[in-house]
Regions:
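Short, charged, solvent-exposed linker or helix-capping segments at domain edges/interfaces
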Residues: 21, 83-89, 208
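Hydrophobic/aromatic-rich core segments of domains that either
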Residues: 129, 161-241
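Short, surface-exposed, polar/charged, turn-prone segments marking secondary-structure boundaries
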Residues: 34-41, 47-51, 66-68, 99-104, ...
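Residue-level signal for pocket-adjacent positions within structured domains
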Residues: 57, 90, 147, 202, ...
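Generic structural "secondary-structure junction" signal
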Residues: 21, 64, 79, 116, ...
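Glycine-rich, small/acidic residue-mixed loop/short-helix segments
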Residues: 23, 27, 31-37, 211-242, ...
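Intrinsically disordered, low-complexity N-terminal segments that are enriched in acidic
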Residues: 1-80
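Secondary-structure boundary elements
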Residues: 13, 71, 77, 81, ...
């Protein structure tokens, strides 16, 4: 499988600041990856510090003065990578409640809804379908600081909100789960996408309650507890405005066929 992905952003820097981007794909062992990444401020290239994190997360950090910053990223991935590695630390960390996936508020609720499926891969299908049936995908319906509880009460959200609710439900029934930002060929409307990963029967398996893109062609960008760990842009000082964002993600040939009951790993 060949996948071409990319992102173009234009950021107006209103006051000097420090920016961190997570738009570059994570390492994909045993695949062929070619990529380019540039940062241009008022026509002049600037350098970013690449910081490597857990799960292959790649943060590109820079201090920028007032001006207009253009970010251009493109990557081609040929083949599929190995399944995500497993560590005991991760299995502990991803059982815990986090800022946007408040699993501790769902313990009784999740046990009632999904208690019969806790020891089965059927759980993933049930949680995905449950979240998908409870929420409406409505761009602009949620705030960046909304968590899983807010999403369930609102009955609407975008991909990050679906992922947070899936993760919270899974953690609440003692299944390690985390959020992953991805490039998603076939997604409409095209954007950065967020999905959940759950640890079941020895593997990290992807769950996407939105059903907006086939899981088999997803490309991993960043992995973490919730959206706070995987944001494509973090601003740490001055004021900025995101004036443009275009995301692309395509496969060579037909998109894979997906079914909610299929067990899929991000590759």
């Amino acid at each position: 499988m060949k996948r071409d992905v990319g992102a173009q952003l234009e950021v107006e820097i209103i006051a000097p600041t420090t920016l961190e981007f997570q738009v570059a794909v994570a390492p994909h062992p045993h695949t062929e990856v070619s990529e380019s990444l540039s940062f241009v401020l008022d026509g002049q290239p600037i350098q970013a510090l690449e910081i490597s994190g857990t799960h292959g997360n790649r943060i590109h950090k820079m201090d920028v003065p007032v001006g207009n910053l253009k970010v251009d990223y493109a990557a081609t991935i040929v083949g599929r990578t190995d399944p995500a590695p497993v560590s005991e630390y991760d299995l502990s960390m991803y059982l815990r409640p986090s800022r946007y996936a408040e699993a501790d508020k769902f313990y009784g609720f999740a046990a009632t809804e999904f208690g019969n499926y806790i020891d089965s891969t059927t759980l993933l299908e049930k949680v995905s379908s449950w979240v998908g049936s409870r929420l409406n995908y409505v761009p602009g319906s949620s705030d960046p600081i909304d968590g899983a509880v807010d999403t369930l009460l609102a009955g609407a959200g975008v991909c990050r909100d679906y992922a947070h609710l899936v993760v919270a439900m899974l953690r609440a029934v003692n299944v390690p789960a985390r959020v992953v930002s991805v490039y998603a060929p076939g997604l409409y409307p095209m954007d950065f996408h967020a999905v959940a990963e759950a640890f079941v029967e020895g593997h990290w398996l992807v769950v996407d309650g939105t059903l907006l893109a086939p899981r088999q062609s997803l490309v991993r960008i960043a992995t973490g507890r919730d959206a706070a760990d995987i944001a494509f842009l973090d601003n740490h000082k001055g004021t900025i405005a995101l004036n443009k964002m275009e995301v692309t993600a395509v496969v060579d040939g037909d998109l894979p066929r997906d079914s909610v009951d299929e067990l899929v790993s991000i590759g």
